[in-house]
Amino acid sequence: MPDVKCVCCKEGKECACKGKECCTTGECCKDGTCCGKCTNAACKCADGCKCGSGCSCTEGNCAC
């Protein structure tokens, strides 16, 4: 299983999750380990996404 890269909400950087659930759980990765949940405020929604507080970080993207 190849490493999955997702946008880490902190500093807007990508990181390798190395098969962990960081991307699907909305956590940020650091050195291949989960290091904290993303907050709605940290999420960067795509253009046109107007979820407000209903925005959640999943796989580097925000979904309503």
From Swiss-Prot:
<protein>
    <recommendedName>
        <fullName>Metallothionein</fullName>
    </recommendedName>
</protein>
<comment type="similarity">
    <text>Belongs to the metallothionein superfamily. Type 4 family.</text>
</comment>
<dbReference type="InterPro" id="IPR001396">
    <property type="entry name" value="Metalthion_4_echinoidea"/>
</dbReference>
<dbReference type="InterPro" id="IPR017854">
    <property type="entry name" value="Metalthion_dom_sf"/>
</dbReference>
<dbReference type="InterPro" id="IPR017980">
    <property type="entry name" value="Metalthion_4_echinoid/annelid"/>
</dbReference>
<keyword id="KW-0479">Metal-binding</keyword>
<comment type="function">
    <text>Metallothioneins have a high content of cysteine residues that bind various heavy metals.</text>
</comment>
<dbReference type="GO" id="GO:0046872">
    <property type="term" value="F:metal ion binding"/>
</dbReference>
<keyword id="KW-0480">Metal-thiolate cluster</keyword>
<dbReference type="Pfam" id="PF05522">
    <property type="entry name" value="Metallothio_6"/>
</dbReference>
